[in-house]
Amino acid sequence: GIDISFYLSEEDMGHPNVARIEAYGIHGAHVVVVGRSLGGGRIMVTNIDGYDVEITGEEYTLLTRHYDKPGVVAKVCEELAKEKINISTMRLFRKGKGSDAVMIIHTDQSVPPAVAEKVKNSNENITYVMALDII
């Protein structure tokens, strides 16, 4: 089952309608996601594990976690190109040179799970890949 707990906080998050979600997996995985309301039922994820991001769910999105090493971006782009998936925007975030990094890619087409798996396996420095469809 799933255990869910809600806590109200007085912490100033820079916006009146912010949610901070901490999720723990049964095998020790942990992620912290911060999002805010944009109004009209729309939301934006603004932070994942300390990385500032902008994910609204209004575009197909591929998210990677990887080490900041040469060739990672090229391999991800190569795998998407092989599948004829066009990149509309791409942003990279890193904690430091050669350190942990996140890449957010918006695409014109959905990224199927099999393609996301190919992306993950395309370079040893890629540690995690998640494909999100439009919501």
Q: What residue spans do the PLM features occupy?
A:
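A conserved regulatory-domain signal marking ACT and ACT-like small-molecule sensing domains
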Residues: 1-135
